[in-house]
Regions:
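A short Gly-Trp-Pro
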Residues: 1-37, 46-93
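Aspartyl protease active-site motif detector
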Residues: 40-42
Length: 93
């Protein structure tokens, strides 16, 4: 499992997240709520649902800060990376 930590970098679209370094992120608004595109330290990009208590998959509480976000609970990609997003930093467990 990847144990890297990194600072986050805000991007202006989801393509920039794919091309950016680990920690790159972009927040978009959908009809269902906000979604964060996030590049994990394992190098993979994932969509993180920022809707609390959703019934159609995992979701995270978000502090609303679009520059240095904090998410709860931890983010876990099985077998690859597990950590916390706190104050604009991805911290490996």
């Amino acid at each position: 499992m990847n144990t890297e930590s990194c600072d986050m970098v805000r991007c202006h679209d989801d393509d920039a997240v794919l091309d950016g370094p680990p920690g790159s992120f972009y927040i978009t608004e959908t009809e269902a709520g906000k979604i964060m595109w996030l590049k994990l330290p394992d190098g993979a990009a994932s969509a993180i649902n920022l809707r609390p208590h959703t019934t159609d998959g995992p979701s995270w509480e978000w502090d609303g800060n679009e520059d240095r976000p904090t998410l709860t609970p931890s983010v876990h990609r099985v077998g690859s990376w597990h950590g916390f997003v706190r104050n604009g930093r991805m911290e490996s467990c």
